[in-house]
Amino acid sequence: FALAHMVNDFDILKSYMDEGANGIETDITFTSEGEPEKAFHGVPCDCKRWCRRQVGIDDYLRHLSDLTTPGNPKFRDNLVVVVLDLKLNGLSEEALRNGGLRLADKLAAHYWSGNRKARAYFIVSVPKTSESEFMKSFRKELDEINFGEMSAKIGFDFTDNGEFSGTQKVYETLGIDEHIWASDGITNCIPLLFRGISRLEDLIHQRDEPGYKYISKVYAWTYDKESSVTLALSLGVDGVMTNYADFVIGILNKPEHSSKYRLATYEDNPFEKFTA
């Protein structure tokens, strides 16, 4: 997956779709009560990016629905996965609970709406395992509003770069043992040299353990240099989050990588393990 980073308005979304990205990451902000508000990152953000792009969440979800509904004039076949990077900083337990509930409501009302034909997969990406109440509330609300079958299109991710054994225990408490993406990364402003790759290697090794259920895919973020992308591919990542989707796709298409990998399409289930 070539995951376009920080896709927070319609113009940049179109630009990344034209580049060929098959996934996007969108930042979702919340009010202090936990109400989903808009697609917005704000400052600081990645180097060489404009941090203040924004659009209201209802309009954004409706637009995504158009882009991912076959037969719609705006349909873009290449958009498979949407990573919702949830900005939950400082929310109380009650606000986290409300946030999960309200995000489920908004997906039902503005993305799937009446016919449920919009086909993108969503990754509900929570910053910290201590904010797991959001996931619990989100899953419960989908069932209560009779959208439980859409759970087939929902995955989960914690992005705190913590020890995954602890993350697994949180998933066990939540009753989640599938549709799990794991990630490792750092802002593009800091060289990968300072971050290192040991945790990324550990996640990939854990994913590949026979019978292991708690990691379906591993992605790295935010990789904008050829050396970093090439290293990630050599390690066996399933996705690269980047500010330059066409650049990553170009590297993927080089003979040394295309013999093993190709860009994922809608026919490739993002919750199934890939076996080379």
UniProtKB/Swiss-Prot annotation:
Positions annotated as active site in the UniProt record: H5, H41
InterPro entries for this protein: PLC-like_Pdiesterase_TIM-brl
An example Gene Ontology CC term for this record: extracellular region
Expression sites (tissue/organ): Expressed by the venom gland.
Keywords from the named record: Cytolysis, Dermonecrotic toxin, Disulfide bond, Hemolysis, Lipid degradation, Lipid metabolism, Lyase, Magnesium, Metal-binding, Secreted, Toxin
Domain of life: Eukaryota
Job description of the protein: Dermonecrotic toxins cleave the phosphodiester linkage between the phosphate and headgroup of certain phospholipids (sphingolipid and lysolipid substrates), forming an alcohol (often choline) and a cyclic phosphate. This toxin acts on sphingomyelin (SM). It may also act on ceramide phosphoethanolamine (CPE), lysophosphatidylcholine (LPC) and lysophosphatidylethanolamine (LPE), but not on lysophosphatidylserine (LPS), and lysophosphatidylglycerol (LPG). It acts by transphosphatidylation, releasing exclusively cyclic phosphate products as second products.
Protein name: Dermonecrotic toxin LafSicTox-betaIE2
Organism, as annotated: Loxosceles aff. spinulosa (strain GJB-2008) (Recluse spider)
